[in-house]
Design a protein with these regions (language model features):
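Short acidic/glycine-rich loops and adjacent helix/strand connectors
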Residues: 1-178
Length: 178
């Protein structure tokens, strides 16, 4: 939590006010402060998956980089209700782990992940044990924790650090050109 505060203050704290001010430019007379509603990131993902589905009841798993604080969530959908039952919070994120690997292999974060996914079937799982043994602690209940000594994404400066480089045998590849 302490590591994430600088990024949260910069990126998230004033986001709602910023959006309301921008919308006010379009229609200054509309009551944006009271009419504009916000839902949590993972709740929105879960709702968009469950409500249009043909299922009356379902367990909905959402995993990505990070929403407000949640990175992984489990929701139970029943009829017209959706209840979040479990969450894993930042900085522990499979999405950010994937982005760190994307960064390390020389692709741009938030745009190169699909390339890594597309190349994955052509590779060998030679780093799977290394990742499981060092980067992630998978708990018996399926939850997980990332060992933060290998990552720098909490500072917003880089995805990985020298410990990550040492673990994988060298520095990250230079980012791809535009």
């Amino acid at each position: 939590f302490k590591m994430a505060i600088p990024i949260w203050l910069k990126e998230k704290l004033f986001q709602k006010d910023l959006l309301r001010k921008q919308f006010k430019k379009f229609d200054p007379d509309f009551d944006w402060m009271n009419k504009l509603l916000f839902s949590e990131h993972h709740f929105s993902h879960a709702a968009s998956a469950f409500f249009p589905s043909p299922f009356e009841e379902a367990c909905v798993l959402t995993m990505d980089g990070v929403g407000e604080w949640a990175t992984t969530s489990v929701a139970l959908g029943q009829g017209s209700k959706l209840e979040m039952t479990k969450e894993i919070h930042f900085p522990h994120s499979l999405g950010l782990l994937y982005s760190a690997l994307t960064y390390y292999t020389g692709f741009r974060v938030n745009s190169g992940e699909y390339k890594v996914m597309g190349l994955a079937p052509y590779g060998e799982p030679k780093y799977a044990d290394l990742i499981r043994d060092n980067l992630i602690d998978i708990k018996e209940d399926g939850s997980f924790r990332l060992d933060q000594k290998y990552f720098d994404y909490c500072t917003g400066l880089a995805m990985t650090n020298r410990h990550f480089d040492d673990l994988f045998g060298g520095p990250a590849r230079t980012a791809e050109e535009l």
